[in-house]
Amino acid sequence: HIHSAIGDEKVSVAMQTARAVRECIDMIEKATGKPIDVLSLSYNRLMNHMKYMVARASTGEKLNLDMNEYMLDQYPQAYKVATDICKNLEGCIGHNLDETETGYLAMHIQRVYKDAV
């Protein structure tokens, strides 16, 4: 019973994470006004980043380089969307994200923007 409960909990967390990531993709598509090509390299990079971002949040691991100021200055629209997504994701996964995650997420969002244009 205990093993089953632990397994069920992991499945629940995985489903919750997948749902949260899908909501984030929807937010990006709404912001760009275009669907994201799920076969693109930018999409795959974004998905991998989000998966590891959630994993880092659950373990407390932090990124070494802060890109927030640069991304905010150079790509304010992508940074705004990244900020909104990070807030949404924190609520969905029940963990706080380190503030440096916003800049890295903005970088991936900007790549998706570039592909969507």
Regions found by a protein language model. Name each.
Residues 1-117:
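A cross-family "folded-core" feature that marks the main globular domain of proteins
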